[in-house]
Amino acid sequence: MPRRRSVEPRKILPDPKFGSELLAKFINVLMVDGKKSTAESIIYGALETLSQRTGKEALEAFEAALENVRPTVEVKSRRVGGSTYQVPVEVRPARRNALAMRWIVEAARKRGDKSMALRLANELSDAADNKGTAVKKREDVHRMAEANKAFAHYRW
């Protein structure tokens, strides 16, 4: 952490097919071992399947799914006088997106479908319908924050 001024976050180039920075970030989250073209083909295949299934435009359906998974509050551990409290804090917008993308990719990887593109399409479809593993994860995080609302005054 620099002392003088805050570091500007790097600008990410939009993805080549849809021109979306959000989708480019999602491609980077999905990418394994630097294989970006593989990640792109998986995502574009999943989005094609998703748009056929929902009847919406691919990017619109993707953003709807992401919106349903984004958390608004989370808990952070805070040590006060020898005991650790789970303190609910609001999630910054950039972290909301990052967590949502990570949870969707994790949930898709755990699914038992044939190809990764199909697994991702199914998870995005479920997320758009407000169900699925990624949405359940968000609900769990929100429930945890709600349960620990009494410790909100320990925020820093």
Curated annotation (Swiss-Prot):
GO cellular component: small ribosomal subunit
Example GO biological process: translation
Domain of life: Bacteria
CDD domains: uS7_Bacteria
SUPFAM superfamilies xrefs: Ribosomal protein S7
GO molecular function, one term: tRNA binding
Keywords: Ribonucleoprotein, Ribosomal protein, RNA-binding, rRNA-binding, tRNA-binding
Keyword Iron-sulfur belongs to the record: no
Family: Belongs to the universal ribosomal protein uS7 family.
Function description: One of the primary rRNA binding proteins, it binds directly to 16S rRNA where it nucleates assembly of the head domain of the 30S subunit. Is located at the subunit interface close to the decoding center, probably blocks exit of the E-site tRNA.
Oligomer and partners: Part of the 30S ribosomal subunit. Contacts proteins S9 and S11.
Protein name: Small ribosomal subunit protein uS7
